[in-house]
Amino acid sequence: MNKYILLIVLLFLVSGRIAAQSVTVDAKIDSLQILIGEQAKVQLQVAMDAKQRAVFPSFTDTLVRGVEIVDIAKPDTQYLNDRQRMLITQEYTVTSFDSALYYIPPMGVKIDNKEYKSKALALKVYSMPVDT
């Protein structure tokens, strides 16, 4: 009898961990290096259960100090596994007018009031060499 109770408890613990791992947040940048004034695309991608609700970060005109947002595309939603899962992609077009190495901290996405974070990114901005 005790073995059955222990087995049931273990099944509940394992199923809770499986459900908790069903959300992934990933961030990518298409160019690690750009020249001043060039543009790069930052992509924030969330994979989750179709019944969950996602709230993406609300940026206005800057991603971080020195990195300006040129455009925020509409989120692209794809349904997977017979509409059981969703993949939502949000794309930000960014630029910079100062040469530096910019650290883009992890971006947070709220899924059913719980925050999940992406990995941090870096963007190196070079100045144009002057011809003499």
Task: State where each predicted segment sits.
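Sec-dependent N-terminal signal peptides
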Residues: 4-14
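Surface-exposed interaction/ligand-binding surfaces
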Residues: 20-132
